[in-house]
């Protein structure tokens, strides 16, 4: 249960959301306007932010339950850990997808030298674009480790529905 509750770092997801908002505010693909002025993209950012806040509240309730009734009280987290793992990995993946979409083709170049101290060449695209695609690809695996999301769904079904 512990690895599933920590598998999707809320702090990391909040950081990804801040980066996404910065990208959307600076990118001017929407008819010369920042991307966050595009109603469709702004709605998608708002949706993921609401999901992240809901997940944070869910996590706090689970931690509270565990701290009151946890292993010392003879109970462990039940489906909460599985649900948190599923939702947090889905949110992580959607955040990185939106980041790649926000910077468009600038997501592709990976300038490893630009990350080194002393780099003074112009970067391809915005500074925050560097490493965006590797991050996106890295977060494809989060739905697999700590038990794939499909396995987590099965565990929830067995535990909660008696299947």
Could you tell me what each predicted segment is?
Residues 32, 53-122:
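C-terminal helix-coil-helix/basic helical segment that borders enzyme active sites and/or dimer interfaces
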Residues 1-10, 106-163:
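Glycine-rich phosphate/cofactor-binding loops in nucleotide/flavin-utilizing enzymes
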Residues 1-6, 41, 69-84, 137-143:
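Short beta-alpha connecting loops at secondary-structure transitions
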Residues 18, 34-43, 74-81, 121-133:
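Glycine-rich, flexible loop segments associated with nucleotide phosphate handling
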Residues 19-27, 48, 58-61, 65, ...:
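Generic, well-ordered alpha-helical scaffold segments in large soluble proteins
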Residues 43, 79, 86, 93, ...:
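A generic structural signal for well-ordered alpha-helical surface patches
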Residues 1-55, 142, 158:
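Glycine-rich beta->alpha junctions and the first turn(s) of the following alpha-helix
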């Amino acid at each position: 249960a512990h690895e599933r509750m920590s598998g999707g770092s809320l702090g990391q997801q909040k950081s990804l959301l801040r980066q996404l908002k910065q990208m959307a505010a600076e990118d001017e693909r929407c008819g010369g306007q920042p991307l966050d002025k595009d109603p469709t993209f702004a709605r998608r950012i708002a949706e993921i932010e609401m999901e992240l806040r809901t997940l944070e509240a869910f996590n706090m309730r689970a931690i509270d339950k565990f701290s009151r009734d946890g292993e010392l009280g003879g109970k462990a987290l039940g489906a909460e850990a599985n649900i948190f793992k599923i939702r947090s990995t889905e949110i992580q993946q959607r955040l990185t997808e939106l980041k790649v979409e926000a910077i468009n083709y600038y997501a592709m170049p990976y300038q490893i030298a630009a990350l080194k101290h002393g780099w003074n060449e112009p970067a391809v695209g915005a500074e925050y674009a560097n490493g965006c695609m590797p991050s996106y690809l890295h977060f494809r695996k989060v739905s697999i480790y700590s038990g794939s999301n499909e396995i987590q769904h099965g565990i929830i079904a067995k535990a909660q529905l008696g299947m």
